[in-house]
Amino acid sequence: MRGSGTPRQFSTQLAVIGSGIAGFAASIFAVNRQIATAQVGNTGALAYTTGYLDLIGKRGGAVVVDPWQALASLRESEPKHPLSRLDAGDIRQAFTEFTDFLGACGLAYSAPGTDNLTALTPAGTLKQTLCVPATMAAGPRALAADAPCVIVDFKGLKGFSGAELAANLRQRWPQLTTQRIVFPGMERGEIYPEVMARALEVAATREQLAAALRAVAGTAKLIGLPAILGMHRPDQVRAELERLTGREIFEIPTMPPSVPGIRLRELMQQVLPQKGVTLIPQQRVTALSFEGDGATLALCDAFGPIRVHAQAVILATGRFLSGGLEAHPAGIREHLLDLPVTQPADRADWYRARYTDPRGHPINSAGIEIDDSFRPLTGEGRRYHERLFAAGVILAHQDWIRGRSGTGIAIATAFKAVTEAERFLAGRQTMVPGASPLQCH
């Protein structure tokens, strides 16, 4: 029976709770610092991401070209915003370290630059982002140059329309055209991006698709596709299709769940254990307690109960979609430790009268409070525990949707939380050279 029996006991230096971008980023930064790490979390929201890595895309409804300048402005107007509490150099290092890690593992990204890139959305609108996957990088370049390009969509694919993209971008991109083809081997019924991406792992499918693309490309120098260029080797799939078609190819995100998000999730689940992280995916921590010598996480899997003993913990459980925060008739609560949540005083004040109110909705800034070391605070303003740190959009005083800053908050605050946890662990002298990354009792 699930949950019965003697718990399996594990010990580690750092436990990361959460499997979204903040949780995986924390594990990456911990691995790079040789901190023995265990990560636990249910599915998280990674599959809902576009693959773009935003820092700050909008401020007050206006498009942000220079996110670093916007960061300085944010510090002036919103000093409690999580990004305002971080040094710009640390944020840049966090993005660089994160993208370098992904690139070394086979998922290349553009490096963080001075200005945002203008990237495409599935609806043919534009957004500002700091880094994009290499498979998407040609899109912003082609848009800026008004290069001759054809967007190709597929019969039976819902949620991605080349005609819609071309219509919405006509004034900005006059040389953009569109074509619809049949995906090889999927001539009937609905088709799905994840299935298409996995099919393109097969050489024969790539050759058939390339032939179909050549037939409709015409004089276009570039071909834009929905994000389907393989699941585990997207850069190689793109390179081969470019060779076979003789044209530069780029991806455009689809509606979620999206292939770029699934790629990230599957890459992390494959690579992090190879780097020494003990990954316990698809499981939710049911209890977290602190003792004098550490913290204990309680959870269960199909084989029974598990206890993970850690010297430090990073809480990166997200907001509502990921289950870090829960909405109840009496208010919003943090589900694991019942940490106090900064929120509107009354449920009636969660939302403004107009859905499109440019000020946003107060509920979207709800979250937990932290001190300057990113340790969660009690209602009295004291640290909940010296071993507990927090990262990601569970933090209060930020509306990541309006600011187009969700990934930036996740990556940058994970970097800070790991930095502070490393400092704490070093002070406790828990780093033992030559020790096994994780010990099982």
Predicted regions and their residues:
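Core beta-strand elements of the Rossmann-like FAD/NAD(P) dinucleotide-binding domain
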Residues: 10-12, 303-312, 384
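N-terminal Rossmann-like FAD-binding beta1-loop-alpha1 element of flavoenzymes
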Residues: 12-39
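Short hydrophobic core segments
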Residues: 15-17, 285, 308-318
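A conserved FAD-binding loop/helix module that cradles the flavin
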Residues: 28, 323-332, 385-386, 393-429
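Conserved N-terminal glycine-rich FAD pyrophosphate-binding loop of Rossmann-like flavoproteins
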Residues: 41-76, 186-199
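Glycine-/small-residue-rich beta->alpha transition segments that form the dinucleotide
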Residues: 43, 303, 310-312, 316-323, ...
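Helical element adjacent to the flavin cofactor pocket in flavoenzyme catalytic cores
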Residues: 160-170, 203-218, 223, 229-287, ...
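FAD-binding beta-loop-beta segment adjacent to the flavin cofactor pocket
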Residues: 303-305, 341-347, 353-400
